Amino acid sequence: MIVEEIQGNIANLSNSEKQKHVEKVYLENSDLVKRIQRVVTDHGTEIGIRLKQPIDLQYGDILYADDHNMIVVDVNSEDLLVIQPRTLQEMGDIAHQLGNRHLPAQFTETEMLVQYDYLVEDLLKSLGIPYVREDRKVNKAFRHIGHSHD
């Protein structure tokens, strides 16, 4: 089977639609940005992914669906630093520092997530910014944004 487009996301399905039999494709965070790849579901089904559009995969994306079954993307957990700034000043300070290092980050209402790096952990300790090291799933890929200093 070759998948060329995403059928939707399980987050947008009705409760009755979520009752279908689900096979999962477990991906590493770095694989979410790959438009072309071969994967195997947790039931052993081989799938080729060749997305027509240049979009990243996300947790819950439906790769295939029929009346009874669906194949859904799941994301393996990852070693993260979960940064929990107490003030806007702390958020600005750490965001500036991480931006200078070109580190991709993700945000929730109260947290900043970065992939584990011992240098970042040392920086957080030295600045006194609260954080925890945690194994956690993220919904989207950590993506580097290119730019120049010209």
Swiss-Prot record:
It comes from Staphylococcus aureus (strain MRSA252). Belongs to the UreE family. GO terms for molecular function: nickel cation binding; unfolded protein binding. Pfam families: UreE_C, UreE_N. This is Urease accessory protein UreE. InterPro entries: UreE (IPR012406), UreE_C_dom (IPR007864), UreE_N (IPR004029), UreE_N_sf (IPR036118). GO terms for biological process: protein folding; protein-containing complex assembly; urea metabolic process. Involved in urease metallocenter assembly. Binds nickel. Probably functions as a nickel donor during metallocenter assembly. The keyword Amino-acid biosynthesis does not apply. The lineage of its organism: Bacteria, Bacillati, Bacillota, Bacilli, Bacillales. GO terms for cellular component: cytoplasm. Keywords: Chaperone, Cytoplasm, Nickel, Nickel insertion. It is found in: Cytoplasm. HAMAP family: UreE.
